[in-house]
Amino acid sequence: MKASYYHTITLMANILDQANIPYQYTGRSALFVQGVDIDEYKKISMDVQWDVFNEALDLFSEYAPTKPERSPETAFFLMDVEGISVTVRCRFNTTIKTDPYRLSIKMGDMEVWCRSLYSYLYEEEMRKFSAEIHAYLSAEQKGFTAENEQAWNQNNYLALVNRYGNPVELASKIKQNPKWRLHPFYKYMGEISGKKITHLMGSNGVKAVALAILGAEVKVVDFSQENAMFANELASGASVSIEYIVSDVLSLSSEHESGNQDLVLMELGVLHYLIDLQPLFEKIKKMLKPGGRFVLHEFHPISTKLITSNGKKHKITGNYFAPAIENNEVAFSKHMPDEEKGSLSRVVQRKWTIGELITSIGQSGLVIKVLEEEPNHKIHDIGLPKTYTLVAERV
C-alpha cells in the first residue's frame, strides 16, 4: 500500500506540474512526502491555486471527480485514484506560491510540493500530527547533533587561543570588567550574586566565568570537549569555580531539571543548531524555579536569513520565511589557519524567524516579558537589527 501511495503522490504531482497548476500536499500526505511515518495510506489531501481550481477539476476528469462543494472560504472535490481517496481543495484569495511554508521535496527524479512540518506552529490541520512531527524531528536531530558535535570537537581549542590568547591572560581581562562581557543583556539578569545560573550551549566559558566572578553559582552545558578545556582553564585563571557538563543540551539528564535555577542563559548563534524548538523550551521550563528567568540573546534573523551587507550596500539575498535546513562552515573556522579550514567538518543549521521563536516559547508555557531588538554598532548598518534579547519567565 505504501508503494501505491508513493506512486499516486508522484503521479498527481506530475499531472499538475505539466499543467502549470500550483499545488501542495497537506496534512498526513505532507508528512509522508517529508519522510514521516504515517499510520494509513488510504487518503491523500492537497491544495491547488484557487483561481485555477476549475482547471484542476477538468484535468482529473478521467478519475470521475465529485461535484465541487463550496463555502465562502474553500472549495473541494473528491476522487478515487488507483484505490486511494483523494481530496483536492482550494482556499479562496490565497496564493500558494507565496506560502512561506510551501516546501519542495525530492521524490525520485521529481520535485514534489508540500506543506512544511513547521506549519504545525500556526495551522490546526498540521497541529493534529504534532506527536508524529516531533518524533520525526527528534530522530533527525540526533543525527544532526552528531555531525555538529564532531565539527565542534576538531581543533576548537586552538581556534579559541588564536582568538582570545592564553586563557589565564583572558581571565585577567574578564576580572577587570565582568559586566561588560554580559552586555547588552546584563540589565535583564538582576542581582547576580548568589543566583543559580545555567548557561546552555555555553561554548568557551567567557560568560560563565564573568557570572562566577560576579558571585553566581554557574553551570555550563555544551557538547564540545575543547570548549570545556578552555573554559575550565579560564575559570582556574580567574580563581572561580564553574561546573562544565559536556553534553548535548537535549540529552541533559533529568537530574538537571529539578526546577531550582534562578536563570537560564543562551546567547549568540545557538538556536540554529536545533531543528525543533519545543523540546528545548520545555527543558528550560523544567530547569527554572517559579519566577525564574530565561534570557536569550541571539542574532536577528533579518541579518542571518534575509540581508547580505557589504559596507554601505545591503542586499536582500535570502528568504526570511524559508524553513530550510542548511549545511554551513563551523563558526570558529574564521579563527583557524587557512591551510586547516578545508579539512574542518561542516555543521547543520536551521535558522528561525522571530515569529517561530515567540510562538514556540509561548506554547511551552513560559511567559514572555521582553523582546528588545538591537542595532548593529557599525555606522553603515544604522536602521538594521543585528541582535535581539528575549526575556521569559516561568510562572
Language model features by range: what are they?
Residues 1-143:
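Compositionally biased terminal segments of proteins
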Residues 137-193, 206:
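Conserved class I S-adenosyl-L-methionine
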Residues 196-252:
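Class I SAM-dependent methyltransferase SAM/SAH-binding core
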Residues 254-264:
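A short acidic, Gly/Pro-enriched loop at the edge of an enzyme's catalytic core
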Residues 262-278:
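A short SAM/SAH-binding and catalytic strip from SAM-dependent methyltransferases
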Residues 278-293:
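A short glycine-rich, Lys/Arg-flanked "PGG" loop and its adjoining helix->strand segment in the class I
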Residues 291, 295-359:
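SAM-dependent methyltransferase
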Residues 356, 360-395:
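C-terminal lobe and adjacent flexible extensions of AdoMet/dcAdoMet transferase-like proteins
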